[in-house]
From Swiss-Prot:
Modified residues (Phosphoserine): 13
Protein task: DNA-dependent RNA polymerase catalyzes the transcription of DNA into RNA using the four ribonucleoside triphosphates as substrates. Component of RNA polymerase I which synthesizes ribosomal RNA precursors.
Keywords recorded for this protein, A-Z: DNA-directed RNA polymerase, Nucleus, Phosphoprotein, Transcription
Protein name per the record: DNA-directed RNA polymerase I subunit rpa34
Amino acid sequence: MAKSSEFVNEESSEDESSVSSIEDQHSSKEPEQSVESNNHGESNAQEDVAEIAGLEKVQGKPVLTTNDLKKESNVFLVRLPPGMSADQISQLKVGSKPTVELKQENENTYQIREESTSSVRVFLPDEQGSYTSNEIKTGYVITETPKISQNIDTGITIPTQAPLVPQRKNLRQHFRPIGDAVGPESEPEAEPKSGIKEHILQETGDATVEELQNKGKEKQKELKKGKREKKDEEEKPKKKKQKKSSKKEKN
């Protein structure tokens, strides 16, 4: 995985122009190299590597929800099969808009940025699996470009005219979080109020359904009895008045 996953990144059209200028510089230096020693040629190649080192830096944009994802026309979150080789990734036919696959069960989400029709950026976890769904700590980038190629054996990067040469370099750098690939966070299930729950437990204990039903009936009877007694107490003074008035009438 470590060898096949070594990629190099190319920035968008702005970087392509800077790359072409590097290529022009390299071609203009060729006559001097033919006259001078091989050592000087090697130093020129190292200078070229230093000049394009800035193009190897890439930073992902944060994508928080599927709605934000739709707004970002050049940023796509996709899932790739585990153990996919660099060559297989470079042969991906993404077209103008890669398909977005969102699955909640898998936390490993990869970000593809399409720089042009022939340039695709892929962020992958490193060989130790040093990757979380919120932050890519170390990533790999692969891009196809006709302008620069890297000699994997020597590590020297030189301009080339060959079309769509895959460049591979291991990028040891930090990326910004890409956020949640699933969408808006799901609301936690509402738990019953602790007070009500405790009160029910205190009242019921380990009682069976029948016992609870009987208790309920008894409570209803007690309530009815209490209401009757209250009513009787309220009606007692009225009854006394009625008795007194009836006695007066008889007299």
